[in-house]
């Protein structure tokens, strides 16, 4: 009964219901858009598009987390502090560089498909994770690390057992931002041949089919909201655990 009162449960249920209902929604969209000969996207199943979309976001976000967290840890060490401005600048440039431009540059070199899309999403996903890692590690009281040092912990042990657990809620908030950005940005990966929930949107825009755009946009928006709520729960759980 508690699950039935959870908004997150109903959001997930709505997403799954839309995935399986949209292929049979022709009467509704035909009534809304009578001028369209094919008002429902049927080239691929929405379930397959959703799985491909989540896989692309998951892989790119994983690399973004590894790179962003690793770089954040490195430049907060004494031996890497001088590289902090450079790392922050590179990450900021990657965030401001349009993903469409990244795809346009990568396609002639790598070809069509997932690879250029993954590169673009990694560039977009690194900055929030890096900034959160720097903020989380920077907020740790120096006395805490000194106590850990006095207990005989090595540098690696202090990072793994003290600093990262304390900074985890802040880092996870950055990961949350990164993943949500990538869920939306992954839609343009369909322009280079990757199957995502953006495929109906891109085809709809190019073919002036508003119904396709609505169908894809509904699923992408719901996926972003669900991811946001899931990470909100994780951040709350980690914050309570840290206390």
From Swiss-Prot:
Keyword Transmembrane helix included in the entry's annotation: yes
Transmembrane segments: 9-29, 47-67, 102-122, 124-144, 162-182, 207-227
GO biological process, one term: transmembrane transport
Expression induction: Expression is sigma S-dependent. Induced by both osmotic shock and entry into stationary phase.
Statement: the UniProt record of this protein carries the keyword Membrane: yes
Gene Ontology CC: ATP-binding cassette (ABC) transporter complex, substrate-binding subunit-containing; membrane; plasma membrane
One Pfam family of this chain: BPD_transp_1
Record domain ABC transmembrane type-1: where: 50-231
Keywords recorded for this protein, A-Z: Amino-acid transport, Cell inner membrane, Cell membrane, Membrane, Transmembrane, Transmembrane helix, Transport
InterPro entries with a match to the protein in the record: ABC_transp_perm/SBD, MetI-like, MetI-like_sf
Membrane-side (Cytoplasmic) residue stretches: 1-8, 68-101, 145-161, 228-243
Gene3D superfamilies: MetI-like (1.10.3720.10)
Membrane topology: Multi-pass membrane protein
Periplasmic side: 30-46, 123, 183-206
Subcellular location: Cell inner membrane
Function: Part of an ABC transporter complex involved in low-affinity glycine betaine uptake. Probably responsible for the translocation of the substrate across the membrane.
Family of this protein: Belongs to the binding-protein-dependent transport system permease family. CysTW subfamily.
Subunit note: The complex is composed of two ATP-binding proteins (YehX), two transmembrane proteins (YehW and YehY) and a solute-binding protein (YehZ).
Protein name in UniProt: Glycine betaine uptake system permease protein YehW
The organism of origin for this protein: Escherichia coli (strain K12)
Gene name per UniProt: yehW
């Amino acid at each position: 009964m508690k699950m039935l009162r959870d908004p997150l449960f109903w959001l997930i249920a709505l997403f799954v219901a839309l995935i399986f209902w949209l292929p049979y929604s022709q009467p509704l969209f035909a009534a809304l858009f009578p001028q369209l000969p094919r008002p429902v996207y049927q080239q691929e199943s929405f379930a397959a598009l959703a799985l491909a979309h989540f896989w692309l976001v998951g892989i790119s976000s994983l690399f973004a987390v590894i790179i962003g967290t690793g770089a954040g840890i490195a430049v907060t060490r004494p031996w890497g502090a001088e590289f902090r401005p450079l790392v922050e600048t590179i990450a900021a440039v990657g965030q401001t560089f349009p993903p469409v431009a990244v795809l346009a540059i990568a396609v002639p070199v790598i070809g069509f498909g997932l690879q250029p899309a993954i590169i673009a999403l990694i560039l977009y996903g690194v900055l929030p994770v890096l900034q959160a890692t720097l903020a989380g590690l920077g907020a740790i009281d120096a006395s805490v690390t000194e106590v850990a040092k006095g207990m005989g912990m090595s540098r690696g042990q202090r990072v793994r057992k003290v600093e990262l657990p304390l900074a985890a809620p802040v880092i996870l908030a950055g990961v949350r931002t990164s993943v949500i950005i990538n869920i939306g940005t992954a839609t343009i990966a369909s322009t280079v041949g990757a199957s995502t929930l953006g495929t109906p949107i891109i085809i709809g825009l190019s073919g002036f089919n508003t119904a396709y755009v609505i169908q894809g946009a509904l699923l992408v928006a719901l996926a972003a909201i669900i991811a946001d709520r899931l990470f909100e729960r994780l951040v709350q759980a980690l914050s309570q655990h840290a206390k």
